[in-house]
């Protein structure tokens, strides 16, 4: 196996000693054999016109952000969750690098140019499971990654899914949402990201057999298997229903990155039972004042066997090789979320009030009070907007009708006691 510092082609993986020439650039290397392959592909395209137009090469020339660059961009929008950001950045980078290589190798007749078929390494898809409490940033991380990579994004709630043939959404509806997000461009949809939330809510009901079919639990997990590992989904055009004699849109999910997430309430207890048996866990129950910190520490130790015990089927866990646990946000992190990200809530309200010709200011005590309320409600970052919206409702109602209002001051009393903000 080559050492990490051995120069090698970024596309075929061959070392410098295995090729005639290796051309180095800032972000990648390419060997003479890959250059010849690309030259032949272009020549074939010129010679045969549109014969190869169905070969997608959208990622071949696109610059792929490195894991460090992805992480730095995530830092601009998401506060904390360093371990999860790192795991996501690496998984997403490897996924789209795999897609880039597969597009170069799309023309079967050219594979021999860069190595025999039996020497080629097939790169498996690294789908991701995010574990973390409500409002910790799971959805935001997935959305932000899709925006940074400029790929279509679709989100689904696992609790609304049922097996095909039952009332509710089936798994193909998720692919339909992605197709809609890509304006029915199949090629774009096949390179997108799907985020499935509340995956923990479809855990199996138990090991005991039941006379009633579990159509929204284990049944949905089974239905998700093919979507996650790769299948060709037949989607009716423009969101209609399937019917006979209808021409369906074929969407291959093999290159769609699947991210699933859930709060997994109670998983920390499952992990605690396992780790205590081996003498490395926590002896106290997770119920004291710092229970959220202990719970987060336990979730960092999650293993596939814990998820199986929780109720996910082994086949599903096997298709989600990247596990990332998010921690519950504390008050300091919530205050940072209010003020620091590019799209921070305080910045959004400042922009709204600027449009009315007024400058809004939140005191430090007001920000602390907002964070405390969100902590008390156990809604995490998701509950911040609701608290601010309620506090500013009356002001936002009156302000557009006021001609001489220049400043709005939000202090602790506005948040805690419902006092109207001071307008001057």
From Swiss-Prot:
Keywords (A to Z) from UniProt: ATP-binding, Chaperone, Metal-binding, Nucleotide-binding, Zinc
The protein's role, per its UniProt record: ATP-dependent specificity component of the Clp protease. It directs the protease to specific substrates. Can perform chaperone functions in the absence of ClpP.
Positions annotated to bind ATP: 133-140
Name the UniProt record assigns to this protein: ATP-dependent Clp protease ATP-binding subunit ClpX
Record SUPFAM superfamilies: Glucocorticoid receptor-like (DNA-binding domain), P-loop containing nucleoside triphosphate hydrolases
Recorded family membership: Belongs to the ClpX chaperone family.
Entry binding sites for Zn(2+): 9, 12, 31, 34
SMART domains: AAA, ClpB_D2-small, zf-C4_ClpX
An example Gene Ontology CC term for this record: HslUV protease complex
Organism: Psychrobacter cryohalolentis (strain ATCC BAA-1226 / DSM 17306 / VKM B-2378 / K5)
Gene: clpX
Subunit structure, as described in the record: Component of the ClpX-ClpP complex. Forms a hexameric ring that, in the presence of ATP, binds to fourteen ClpP subunits assembled into a disk-like structure with a central cavity, resembling the structure of eukaryotic proteasomes.
Listed transmembrane segments: none
Annotated ClpX-type ZB domain residues: 1-50
Gene Ontology BP, a term: proteolysis involved in protein catabolic process
MF (Gene Ontology): ATP binding; ATP hydrolysis activity; ATP-dependent protein folding chaperone; protein dimerization activity; unfolded protein binding; zinc ion binding
Any Pfam family matching the protein: zf-C4_ClpX
């Amino acid at each position: 196996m080559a050492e990490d510092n051995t120069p090698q082609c970024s596309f075929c993986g061959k070392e410098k000693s295995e090729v005639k020439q290796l051309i180095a650039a800032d972000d990648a290397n390419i060997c003479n054999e890959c250059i010849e392959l690309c030259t032949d592909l272009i020549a074939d395209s010129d010679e045969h016109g549109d014969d190869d137009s169905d070969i997608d090469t959208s990622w071949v020339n696109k610059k792929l952000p490195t894991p460090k660059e992805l992480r730095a961009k995530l830092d601009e929008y998401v506060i904390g969750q360093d371990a999860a950001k790192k795991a996501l950045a690496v998984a997403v980078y490897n996924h789209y690098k795999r897609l880039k290589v597969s597009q170069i190798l799309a023309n079967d007749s050219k594979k021999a140019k860069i190595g025999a078929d039996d020497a080629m390494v097939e790169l498996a898809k690294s789908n991701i499971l995010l574990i973390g409490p409500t409002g910790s940033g799971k959805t935001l991380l997935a959305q932000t990654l899709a925006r940074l990579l400029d790929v279509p994004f679709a989100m689904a709630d696992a609790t609304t899914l049922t097996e095909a043939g039952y009332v509710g959404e089936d798994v193909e509806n998720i692919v339909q949402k992605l197709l809609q997000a890509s304006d029915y461009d199949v090629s774009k949809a096949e390179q997108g990201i799907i985020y499935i939330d509340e995956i923990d809510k479809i855990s199996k009901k138990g090991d005991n057999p039941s006379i009633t079919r579990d159509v929204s639990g284990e049944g949905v997990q089974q239905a998700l298997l093919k979507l996650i590992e790769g299948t060709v989904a037949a989607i009716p055009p423009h969101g209609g229903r399937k019917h006979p004699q209808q021409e369906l849109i074929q969407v291959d999910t093999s290159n769609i990155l699947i991210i699933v997430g859930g709060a997994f309430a109670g998983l920390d207890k499952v992990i605690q039972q396992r780790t205590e048996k081996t003498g490395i866990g926590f002896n106290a129950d997770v119920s004291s004042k710092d229970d959220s910190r202990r719970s987060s520490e336990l979730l960092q130790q999650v293993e596939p066997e814990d998820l199986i015990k929780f109720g996910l089927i082994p086949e599903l866990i096997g298709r989600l090789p990247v596990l990332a646990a998010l921690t519950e946000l504390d008050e300091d992190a919530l205050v940072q979320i209010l003020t620091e990200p590019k799209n921070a809530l305080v910045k959004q309200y400042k922009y709204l009030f600027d449009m009315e010709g007024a400058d809004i200011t939140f005191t430090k005590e007001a920000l602390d009070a907002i964070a405390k309320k969100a902590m008390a409600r156990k809604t995490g970052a998701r509950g911040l907007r609701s608290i601010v919206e309620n506090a500013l409702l009356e002001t936002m109602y009156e302000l557009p009708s006021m001609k001489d209002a220049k400043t709005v001051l939000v202090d602790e009393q506005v948040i805690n006691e419902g006092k109207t903000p001071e307008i001057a």
